[in-house]
């Protein structure tokens, strides 16, 4: 059974904290965290990401960005990344986790989720919609 899920993006301030919170809301009994491949360590969630998430009832208020580590990878049952190239980057940190590293967009046709950082509000809205859809598909798959 998958009890711990790690959501990964680059900076851990836009996509992964949003994905983490969406999964946490739907799967409160599971341990869900997020981290970044090149995290803005100690930073809070991006302001626009926070505003957009909040408007959809998801709070990123107390998020603190953290750097992905080999131990985090080892201790997670499932690692969800935003882009295909992130799979290789995660595996450079801990090569043993390849079999449990998948795209967050796996259930929506292996869709990659673009980074909205420093882009328009519309970009953040679009990314939120994709994350929400993908998270629901993961919830459905993990609840079987």
UniProtKB/Swiss-Prot annotation:
It comes from the Bacteria. GO terms for molecular function: protein tyrosine phosphatase activity. The active site is at 9 (nucleophile), 15, 115 (proton donor). GO terms for biological process: polysaccharide biosynthetic process. Keywords: Exopolysaccharide synthesis, Hydrolase, Protein phosphatase, Virulence. It holds the Pfam family LMWPc. Coiled coil: none annotated. It catalyses: O-phospho-L-tyrosyl-[protein] + H2O = L-tyrosyl-[protein] + phosphate. The keyword Phosphoprotein does not apply. Its EC number is 3.1.3.48. It is an enzyme of class 3 (hydrolase). InterPro entries: LMW_PTPase, Ptyr_pPase, Ptyr_pPase_sf, Tyr_phospatase_low_mol_wt. PANTHER family: LOW MOLECULAR WEIGHT PROTEIN TYROSINE PHOSPHATASE, LOW MOLECULAR WEIGHT PROTEIN-TYROSINE-PHOSPHATASE ETP-RELATED. May function as a phosphatase required for amylovoran (an exopolysaccharide that functions as a virulence factor) production. Belongs to the low molecular weight phosphotyrosine protein phosphatase family. This is Probable low molecular weight protein-tyrosine-phosphatase AmsI. It comes from Erwinia amylovora. The gene is amsI.
């Amino acid at each position: 059974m998958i009890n711990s899920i790690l959501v990964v993006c680059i900076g851990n301030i836009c996509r992964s904290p949003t994905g983490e919170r969406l999964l946490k809301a739907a799967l409160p009994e599971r341990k869900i965290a997020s981290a970044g491949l090149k995290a803005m360590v100690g930073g809070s969630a991006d302001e626009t990401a926070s505003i957009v998430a909040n408007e959809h009832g998801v709070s990123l208020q107390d998020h603190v960005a953290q750097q992905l580590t080999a131990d985090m990878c080892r201790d997670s049952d499932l690692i969800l990344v935003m882009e295909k190239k992130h799979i290789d980057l995660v595996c450079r940190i801990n090569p043993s986790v390849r079999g449990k590293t998948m795209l967050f967009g796996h259930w929506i046709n292996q869709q990659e989720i673009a980074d909205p950082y420093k882009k328009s509000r519309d970009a953040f809205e679009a990314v939120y919609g994709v994350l929400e859809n993908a998270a629901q598909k993961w919830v459905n798959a993990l609840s079987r």
